[in-house]
């Protein structure tokens, strides 16, 4: 008996020592990294008490009080409960098992999703209905690269003082000395401040231009004669020019970190913003490990809608980011204009390229060469001169000439890999870059430049090789008309894998070649040696689409200040304009369609979603009761609150478990039949009695039934329930993506449309 006890004691000691040795070995090989410890809803304790509680929790894992204080970087505590600390992986894992912790995840770097757009959307200046008094009380928080408050787009002439509800601050710093009555607040977040370029730290000033661009798209005042070096000349303005901007700088030269974004959300919610716009994204993660999903949930609890960019990794499927159903995820579509940069060859042939070339030619023709002919590499030298790689061309062969560069062959290569910088450094006169694939996105060039389609590039090569004295000229970019809207090639597509039965993106907005304000601290091309500065610039990305949707949300809120975030989002989705696009991606690329702000202020019916409904959805998605309780504060130390329990949630919530404005289902690849039921509740936001009749559009082979088919309302705020039953057989004609729709029509101008999309990934759906 004694012998067995000794053996057990020995084995216990051995395991403890062995685990300690393993941990020590890990510590030697792994550097401590910042982790975010998310603990749900903030308690009613003071920030000082919250920070001390975080320290005590960390100390239980670290085992040393002074070391714990050294390792803790930051505490959240205004609306979001949690902290950031430098941890080893095994310490993070141990913390994740502690009572009161929802999740522990590594701090990562995320990236920005980088004029006439409001006219294109129907908000023609002086010709659309506005509620200016209420609009001026709306505050949009922009989480981005900061702001240039000196831009004419943020002139506060005639603008009254900030709304009384505003609780934020203007934090001044280098190159940022003041706010005004338009930009009423500015803060910067860089919890780990090392590694910043000189002059960029400790300031909300925008050294990139991105934040100034997005902010002015939302609420910039009207500025006439705005252009980028004469390109796209016209009037620049925001969608809600009387609204206020609060700038939260979370993105720096190195990127945008999770911990900084979460800190900005915590501040913005407390400051009193009404809408949050964040054009940032990264890898898709479970909601409790996604800082944007976490921050947006806490914002939603305070009545704040968060608009997010869908991402720029298109056109492939499963590329969309920002997937939480409580955020509005925005795809990018085109305007009815494009930028054309014509190249003319010495033999009279022309090629229509794309760029933002603000240089007028000084000669009728320039000598033309190619990267291959301008090579300075000896036999066996490293590099590819045909694509104009740095270090492969000779100055004596480039000086004063236009250089043609073939398309790069790297994965995803599409030209534009700095060839303009290479050619300018060798005193070249211009650059023509061949594209592997067509693009709709125009970019600024350091010298005269144009990006031409692959076939045109081949003809240019043939011309160069056919004559002893090839010549070419690159004309200044001009604006031409095009059919629109269409989804931009870069815009990320669904479906998604985190919550497979929620359709993302939700909606689309202009994001291609958008003219808006720019920072005087940022170069036009992003090259450090580009000394040109401009008050306005043209940028593309879902980053540019997101602020259009944020402004549209603010516009709707100016007419309906008491509406919930979900109601505003529903109004924009159900009144959106469906799009026709090439291929079979359908709603996976544009969601419900392009925003139509004028229709959205009178949607007729809305699909509202409460906080409790989102919690039921999280239960259905498999998140545990304890974590959900912490998210809401129901599992806090407050003894008057009951613990949240998913077991008490009513079952039979339908195919998606949420009162979402769109209907989506990812079908198992082995299933030949489709059989789904969606339950929905609509709220009447129209005036007077009304009757709505359901209209269904569905392809052959798919039966879509709405029960009941008629709904009547006597007064505003009345609710009605209905269900949508979908049955069919998945045959070859349906391919992998099937689109349908349900529309509720009251014959008085209200048409409430919900797209239906079924997806099965085993087919060739392209």
UniProtKB/Swiss-Prot annotation:
PROSITE patterns: SUBTILASE (PS51892), SUBTILASE_SER (PS00138)
Active-site residues, as the UniProt record annotates them: 144, 210, 543
Family matches, as CDD domains: PA_subtilisin_like (cd02120), Peptidases_S8_3 (cd04852)
Presence of the UniProt keyword Zinc in the record: no
Subcellular location: Secreted
Enzyme Commission identifier(s): 3.4.21.-
Record protein name field: Subtilisin-like protease SBT4.15
Taxon lineage: Eukaryota, Viridiplantae, Streptophyta, Embryophyta, Tracheophyta
Gene this chain is encoded by: SBT4.15
